């Protein structure tokens, strides 16, 4: 074998000293990697961060083992340190002194069994040689080092896979996060574990969640800039706060093959057609004759405009609230429906929402505006006489389909509302009712509907997911008897079932006034959807009903 070239005079004794010096290095490694109880070689996953070197000090060869290892937690570290200390105290282990001369460039034949001294750090292509002679690739040995290899995929609920390669979060970064980003004044970390696209930290939250989140975020930006994103969430397993840090590159917005504006425009054109079709009773009875009688669609313009106005106000309110809270919305997709004209619009949130209150503001703004305009128009329809003096002749039994509309009809029309007696009303009633129904079905607390987001913002992820499952189940049962419910539950299941993307900080609850608005919206939507069970004519009450 060859030793590193030294500038010293050759002699046989110096060569023997060099060989003995390298032997001492081997014994130090043996002492540091042997199991203390049995003396057997330890199969530990190690990462050698330095190397063995030969140094010249005052004409002496000094062999130093400068290894820094990270053993697995199964070994007894204290006993290993004691054994290493005993060996290091022996002069035969620490150093070998040669008074005259220096090492030759090559060793004698007696030292041919020794291995070459590695004077360079291990590279990723090197292998780690175990004491018992088994060679393990360095890439396998590094798996036991505390370096997190994050799997490609959804970093958090609601996030989509965007990366083609995995993201590596080094141990040094995790240590900085634990020791310098988090702290006793914000979030005291007790443990951490890989969490899909990042690292989940468990611990104790200190102070108000919103203020603690702001402090942690500022420290994170000071250390790493915009490289990482912090989420402060509730662990659904134990309902305790957890902090999740993920690389921002895993949070890239989802891209689509078809431009959003093109798809949205296509859906919008079809929705206009179904809104017109919905307000032409002659075509409703025979849909196949629609294309042969397109001129009849002009009769549905006024009804389509009223319903579209209610839907439009709903979406405009979403946009204004989102602009006020810094939330970015995608292009709305209007969903056509031949039964009621439209199911409203599907609007994605494309950035990360700051907290639950901001989500509640945006989610509640649409139904609040839509319900307000629809309710006013419904009242006007009951109060104002038909413009042509004739109006629209209907069977009063239709009002039993909605508790809200049936109650208003009974309150305003009074004795004129009788079972089995035809009634002439202003068509504005039906137009406004359709707009209210569209807002109501979007207020169902399920998935990523407005109602689902409202429930999430008010009660958190765990409770809202249970409410969502219950709502979808009840909607599925009603789908057996109602075709509108059938198509709506199918649409929710395939397009809107969630989960809702994580918020930056999900712990702080909204203010009570916003919660009151959210509850009112859910109740109002329920009144629109539930049937009116009471007869309109008191004379038709039976003894059983009384």
UniProtKB/Swiss-Prot annotation:
Pfam (any one): Peptidase_M50
EC number(s) stated in the UniProt entry for this protein: 3.4.24.-
Targeting signal (transit peptide) range: 1-64
Enzyme class: hydrolase
Region (Disordered): 67-143
Biased composition (Polar residues): 89-110, 118-130
Keywords, sorted A to Z: Chloroplast, Hydrolase, Membrane, Metalloprotease, Plastid, Protease, Transit peptide, Transmembrane, Transmembrane helix
Annotated function: Probable membrane-associated metalloprotease that may be involved in chloroplast development.
Keyword Transmembrane recorded: yes
Compartments where located: Plastid, Chloroplast membrane
A cellular component annotation (GO) from this entry: chloroplast membrane
The UniProt record lists the keyword Zinc: no
Residue ranges with Acidic residues bias: 69-86
Similarity annotation: Belongs to the peptidase M50B family.
A GO MF term: metallopeptidase activity
The protein, known as: Probable zinc metalloprotease EGY2, chloroplastic
Membrane topology, from the record: Multi-pass membrane protein
Organism: Oryza sativa subsp. japonica
Top-level taxon of origin: Eukaryota
A Gene Ontology biological process term: proteolysis
PROSITE patterns reported in the protein's UniProt record: ZINC_PROTEASE
